[in-house]
Amino acid sequence: MAGGEAGVTLGQPHLSRQDLTTLDVTKLTPLSHEVISRQATINIGTIGHVAHGKSTVVKAISGVHTVRFKNELERNITIKLGYANAKIYKLDDPSCPRPECYRSCGSSTPDEFPTDIPGTKGNFKLVRHVSFVDCPGHDILMATMLNGAAVMDAALLLIAGNESCPQPQTSEHLAAIEIMKLKHILILQNKIDLVKESQAKEQYEQILAFVQGTVAEGAPIIPISAQLKYNIEVVCEYIVKKIPVPPRDFTSEPRLIVIRSFDVNKPGCEVDDLKGGVAGGSILKGVLKVGQEIEVRPGIVSKDSEGKLMCKPIFSKIVSLFAEHNDLQYAAPGGLIGVGTKIDPTLCRADRMVGQVLGAVGALPEIFTELEISYFLLRRLLGVRTEGDKKAAKVQKLSKNEVLMVNIGPLSTGGRVSAVKADLGKIVLTNPVCTEVGEKIALSRRVEKHWRLIGWGQIRRGVTIKPTVDDD
């Protein structure tokens, strides 16, 4: 932006220009060139059992190592939600056979580049820009996985070829995305380089049997090796052909769910150089623009003298928008976006704002403290290893006053069941949440020291609280 007119992106000249003065949101689509040049418009989650290669597949496709934190690197597991963007290109030379004509690169690659395949001519052209939400596979991190599922449009289900199928979290994650009503799934049979062909075929039959009757029935099963980058271009081709870009709403008031938040200041920074907090998330609808006034709900939560919950929404302004390293003038629904604000950075540090909703002032939904839900319980517990042919434990009915973990979109909060009927329940939430009637929620219960998915529900109505606004 330095030295240029306001409202025009000048960073990264090799990407499409974005100009706020000529922006007409009614003409934008999820495949508009000026949008996908800089940001992803579709979110794809990677799900599956621990150590089946979810993060490695994301790295093979996008070139980004999603494991960001020291304790994650040392233990070689994903703990927080990882994320990475990738551009998928197709060669415009019709003589080039599929799947070689598909290619994936990092998100700041130019939108067109000449072919390097011998015997072909023409350019690789950008066809999709996808965002990967890399979920943890550990059973104790199930809550994080459910938060990630809130923003997914499709999923890659990873199954390691050198273990029998299904492993505990394979089935638990599959149940979770069924709840989220994800229709588009690709199954990746990974680590194919470690097994003989006969084993791979045998496991292929196991996978078919496992997905029968689930939402993943009929999904393509692609044998890959993420480490050797074998068949990754086939995955790219299937992402383009099999996963439709969801229709998006560009004209409503913008709304973004926060799934990460940071304080970007280094310790010892001069006061004048302090930057505001950064919220990362996925826009559900509408378009956010640089310079826009925003509101964050529920905001700062506290209790009054009588112990009642109070919420004070945060009002601020957007200073910058980013998609990975690409700076934006406006951000459309879809991939993960970083929103630089003027909010006090201590409110954003270390994911403190996760589960809050950010959007246009006065256009955000109500804040609920109690929910009345219609719910549906799973028959048996998932994700628990069972010995031999023993069936998994049955899920007990909800009982009054028990404490559950409730996942509403990207927010996990505790909830106490205050009343329960056949398929209706009332839940008093530990933390207030900004949501709408009709929203889906996932319910988990503490079983043997771990939270386990036991069912899901839909919000029928609830008790809302009025946010307090300062009069000064």
Curated annotation (Swiss-Prot):
CDD domains: eIF2_gamma, eIF2_gamma_II, eIF2_gamma_III. Residues 134-137 are annotated as: G3. GO terms for cellular component: cytosol; eukaryotic translation initiation factor 2 complex. Residues 457-469 are annotated as: Interacts with CDC123. The modification N-acetylalanine is found at residue 2. Gene3D superfamilies: P-loop containing nucleotide triphosphate hydrolases, Translation factors. GO terms for molecular function: GTP binding; GTPase activity; methionyl-initiator methionine tRNA binding; translation initiation factor activity. Residues 76-80 are annotated as: G2. Residues 39-248 form the tr-type G domain. Residues 190-193 are annotated as: G4. GO terms for biological process: cytoplasmic translational initiation; formation of translation preinitiation complex. InterPro entries: EFTu-like_2 (IPR004161), eIF2G (IPR050543), eIF2g_C (IPR015256), eIF2g_dom_2 (IPR044127), eIF2g_GTP-bd (IPR044128), P-loop_NTPase (IPR027417), T_Tr_GTP-bd_dom (IPR000795), Transl_B-barrel_sf (IPR009000). Member of the eIF2 complex that functions in the early steps of protein synthesis by forming a ternary complex with GTP and initiator tRNA. This complex binds to a 40S ribosomal subunit, followed by mRNA binding to form the 43S pre-initiation complex (43S PIC). Junction of the 60S ribosomal subunit to form the 80S initiation complex is preceded by hydrolysis of the GTP bound to eIF2 and release of an eIF2-GDP binary complex. In order for eIF2 to recycle and catalyze another round of initiation, the GDP bound to eIF2 must exchange with GTP by way of a reaction catalyzed by eIF-2B. This is Eukaryotic translation initiation factor 2 subunit 3. It comes from Pongo abelii.
